[in-house]
């Protein structure tokens, strides 16, 4: 088998009927005047920002933020200049208590995590403006489940952070004998107090990586 890259996986999937159908639906919606997030050039940013062999940590989100210009292809992240969404505020709150010296940044762009080896994957990669989960059933999860399966099969000793019920449904794809899985509630204001705040997933991730003789993640942004 040739060296596995995201380009190879995408080139295989893009020719399959389900994948073509996703973009047929997106193009139809755009023609009808609907606004789709993220911008088309940003949909696959998670694959551009973190090479397959560089991944150490996988954080699984649900679908992109559906507000104006919030989504840019990385789960939980927003571009510079966009106000922090509530879930991201809670992520920073947990980091402040979990990681000594962490200073809450004034922006919500998590791209530097991507460069550290943190794969910020939404299971649904697009959304209609103002309509959460509007693209939940157009086929994206067939693709992102394949991505998770590929990581599970061809990598080992990854840390999977599964926050909330939706992410936790992906645990059946992940072999917990090969990988380290950490589970807690979603960081949204509705559920953060039921486990996320105080979970210490960031320090636990680094402890695991250090025990595997891997470089730890610099969570400071």
Swiss-Prot record:
GO terms for biological process: base-excision repair, AP site formation via deaminated base removal. It comes from the Bacteria. InterPro entries: UDG_fam1, Ura-DNA_Glyclase_AS, Uracil-DNA_glycosylase-like, Uracil-DNA_glycosylase-like_sf. The keyword Hydrolase applies. Keywords: Cytoplasm, DNA damage, DNA repair, Hydrolase. The active site is at residue 63. One of its GO terms (cellular component) is cytoplasm. SUPFAM superfamilies: Uracil-DNA glycosylase-like. It is found in: Cytoplasm. CDD domains: UDG-F1-like (cd10027). GO terms for molecular function: uracil DNA N-glycosylase activity. PROSITE patterns: U_DNA_GLYCOSYLASE. It catalyses: Hydrolyzes single-stranded DNA or mismatched double-stranded DNA and polynucleotides, releasing free uracil. Its EC number is 3.2.2.27. It holds the Pfam family UDG. The keyword Cytoplasm applies. Belongs to the uracil-DNA glycosylase (UDG) superfamily. UNG family. This is Uracil-DNA glycosylase.
């Amino acid at each position: 088998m040739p060296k596995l890259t995201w380009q190879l996986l995408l080139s295989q999937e893009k020719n399959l009927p389900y994948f073509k159908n996703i973009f047929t639906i997106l193009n139809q919606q755009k023609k009808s005047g609907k606004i789709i997030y993220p911008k088309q050039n940003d949909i696959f940013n998670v694959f551009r920002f973190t090479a397959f062999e560089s991944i150490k940590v996988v954080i699984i989100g649900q679908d992109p933020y559906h507000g104006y210009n919030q989504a840019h292809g990385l789960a939980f992240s927003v571009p510079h200049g966009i106000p922090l969404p509530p879930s991201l505020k809670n992520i920073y709150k947990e980091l402040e208590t979990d990681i000594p010296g962490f200073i809450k940044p004034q922006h919500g762009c998590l791209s530097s995590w991507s460069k550290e080896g943190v794969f910020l994957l939404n299971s649904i990669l697009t959304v209609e403006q103002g309509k959460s989960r509007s693209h939940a059933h157009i086929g994206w999860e067939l693709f992102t489940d394949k991505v998770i399966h590929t990581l599970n099969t061809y990598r080992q000793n990854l840390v999977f952070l599964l926050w909330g019920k939706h992410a936790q449904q992906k645990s059946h794809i992940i072999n917990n004998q090969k990988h380290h899985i950490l589970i807690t509630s979603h960081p949204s204001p509705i559920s953060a107090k039921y486990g996320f705040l105080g979970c210490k997933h960031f320090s636990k991730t680094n402890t695991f990586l250090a025990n595997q003789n891997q470089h730890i993640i610099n969570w400071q942004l």
